[in-house]
Amino acid sequence: MDIFQALFLGLLQGLTEFLPISSSAHLILTPAFFGWEDQGVGFDLSVHVGTLLAVVLYFRRDVFGIARDGLISMGQRKIVGQGALAWYLVIGTIPAGLAGLALLDMIDNELRGASVIFFTTLVFGILLGIADWLPKRQRTMDSLNWKDAVIVGIAQAMALVPGTSRSGVTITAGLFLGMTRETASRFSFLLAIPIIVLASAVKLLEVATSDVIVDWNGFLIGGVTSFLMAITAIHFFLKWLNKVGMWPYVIYRIILAGVIYAVLM
């Protein structure tokens, strides 16, 4: 992997991980479009770590408060502060974790083609637009319950299929449940933390137990660029959220689906 490829893919991962446009679709399609070889599991690990550090740093106060109150709630056997939210994040992670263990090989082998990504990019983009268009979205973080966590968690599991977009489908589910844009987005981003930790652990195990030779230059470039781009993307996404809504991302997904159909199908 040359420096340009590592830089480009790191920036791309950081930009697309938290925007509702699917990072996996972009990381699959871009090498195919440019004729690049697969970036390798070591690079995948680096960009996962970069985006994980970005979301943890950006939401550091939330993360600290949720972790603290979750541990206190466990010790006292009653909900304290944000202890309930800690449990909702655990509940919301379980469906994707189980689906990943059961279906990841099948998804990697059979659901990474252009036709699948075209379908998921288009259909889930339209669903995001419909969810954003619906009125009466007034629910805040304080109103969340375990049923919301289960539904959003199931939606997150669907994002194992490339093109769906983890942030996109979880925000869509939140909006359909009546959450405000900010609530749906913040819950989605917080829910990303445990799932990225799990994904990073899987990649780390794969690196540690195989004969993979890690390109450390690419690893460093990918990790740093994905971190910087991800924290920037989160900031501006939330800053502009109520001004522009989800429609720029919906339109982009429709255009991207058209490009996939025209060029790769």
Swiss-Prot record:
Its EC number is 3.6.1.27. The chain crosses the membrane at residues 1-21, 39-59, 84-104, 114-134, 144-164, 187-207, 218-238, 244-264. Its main location: membrane. Pfam families: BacA. It is found in: Cell inner membrane. InterPro entries: UppP. It is an enzyme of class 3 (hydrolase). The keyword Transmembrane helix applies. It catalyses: di-trans,octa-cis-undecaprenyl diphosphate + H2O = di-trans,octa-cis-undecaprenyl phosphate + phosphate + H(+). One of its GO terms (biological process) is regulation of cell shape. GO terms for cellular component: plasma membrane. It is a multi-pass membrane protein. GO terms for molecular function: undecaprenyl-diphosphatase activity. PANTHER family: UNDECAPRENYL-DIPHOSPHATASE. Bacitracin is thought to be involved in the inhibition of peptidoglycan synthesis by sequestering undecaprenyl diphosphate, thereby reducing the pool of lipid carrier available. Catalyzes the dephosphorylation of undecaprenyl diphosphate (UPP). Confers resistance to bacitracin. Belongs to the UppP family. This is Undecaprenyl-diphosphatase. It comes from Marinobacter nauticus (strain ATCC 700491 / DSM 11845 / VT8). The gene is uppP.
